Amino acid sequence: MRNTILFGVSMILLANLCFGIMSAFVKITADYFSPMENVFYRSITMTLLLLLIYPFKPYRLKSYKQGGFKKLAFRVVVGGLAMLAFFYNIEKISLATATAFSQCAPIYTVLLSPLLLKEKLKRSTLISACIGIVGVVLISDPSVENVGPVEIFMGILSGIFVSLAYITLRDLREYYDKQAVILAFAFGMSLLGLVGMFIDIPFLSTGIHVPRKEDILWISLIGISGTLGQYFLTYAYMNAPAGIIAPIEYTRIVWGLLFGLYLGDTFLDLKSSLGVALILCSGLLIALPALLKELKKI
């Protein structure tokens, strides 16, 4: 049991490192490609890699039972919108702040679950979520960096859409193999990104920019790191309880800070640092009951 949990923890740490590397590569390419193009290149590379792996490690592509397609399509759409909003913020603001906005998903999940899943909300959980909301307000300061109304809006949207994707994943387990969900997400996002590149959308899609020689490397690395991150994430949740894995996901913010500083981001000021700290505390407090429950079983 302990070895399995240790393996799961190792997997989530590797997943967060890979996602941090992917975000750094997206920031590098953001000077040339639009967020929509980065979504497409990230997704199409991931799709090709998954298709290459499939013959060596096949899995069930058909659903276990009927009724899951609409939920899968919804997961693809909200997951894609979350990625698009996140990639926009990576271009405009510091990597740490963009990542912090995205990692607010558990806070929104707490607030949305009573409405969407009819789950009863505990007072302690609500207080934890409110702490996180205060953190969001602190990092949404227009006087800091380039965090304007659009960046704040995109940041909140990225967190909300990620939370909706997580909520949907709970139901999808009954219908599809986990690997099939990953492939469907990658393929669906490739289609959405491809169509989106031909539509002029302010801030998000500004036409098609033909990849230069040096861009091929960055595009490949974005896809490879994103695919590895997704696989490590899947294996983490397959080998260890979610209550133990979920709190560790916040190390992604640390990688966002470190890679951002390496790429030239300024260090967060006191107000933004406090906001990120509150978001971290909020997520940990939300996950704490499940964490303690799982630790007692060891």
Swiss-Prot record:
Ranges for domain EamA: 17-141, 183-288
Alphabetical UniProt keywords: Cell membrane, Membrane, Repeat, Transmembrane, Transmembrane helix, Transport
Membrane topology (UniProt): Multi-pass membrane protein
Transmembrane intervals: 5-25, 36-56, 76-96, 97-117, 124-144, 147-167, 181-201, 216-236, 244-264, 272-292
Signal peptide limits: none
Subcellular location per the Swiss-Prot or TrEMBL entry: Cell membrane
Family: Belongs to the EamA transporter family.
Protein name per the record: Uncharacterized transporter HP_1234
Naturally occurring in which organism (per UniProt): Helicobacter pylori (strain ATCC 700392 / 26695)
Top-level taxonomy: Bacteria, Pseudomonadati, Campylobacterota, Epsilonproteobacteria, Campylobacterales
